[in-house]
Curated annotation (Swiss-Prot):
Species name: Shewanella sp. (strain W3-18-1)
Family matches, as NCBIfam families: rplX_bact
Role noted for this protein: One of two assembly initiator proteins, it binds directly to the 5'-end of the 23S rRNA, where it nucleates assembly of the 50S subunit.
Family according to the record: Belongs to the universal ribosomal protein uL24 family.
Gene Ontology molecular-function annotations: rRNA binding; structural constituent of ribosome
GO CC field: ribonucleoprotein complex; ribosome
Alphabetical list of Pfam families matching this protein: KOW, ribosomal_L24
Designated name of the protein: Large ribosomal subunit protein uL24
Binding partners and assembly: Part of the 50S ribosomal subunit.
InterPro entries membership: KOW, Rib_uL2_dom2, Ribosomal_uL24, Ribosomal_uL24_CS, Ribosomal_uL24_KOW, Translation_prot_SH3-like_sf
SUPFAM superfamilies: Translation proteins SH3-like domain
Gene3D superfamilies, A to Z: 2.30.30.30
Amino acid sequence: MAAKIRREDEVIVLAGKDKGKRAKVSQVLPTGKLILEGINLVKKHQKPNPQLGVAGGIVEKEAPIQASNVAIFNSATGKADRVGFRFEDGKKVRFFKSNSELVK
């Protein structure tokens, strides 16, 4: 099945502590979760590892967010939108359901 949200897509967070924020998808995980740039930051207590040259301390990192909690951002309308699929010239393409424009 083709993915409705892909890497480098701009999305809006629909639920959670970062609700309403826009971000770019940096990674799509096979478990149906996404990692967004600067969204869902958590503090991880990192243990030092001198063999790998990793310093210890409290590190902020991006945690995965469920794909159902985000919607793709339509720059033409300036709102969150839904994605559909259709065939054009024998290729399957994604389009916005509100205005039928292709997703870039």
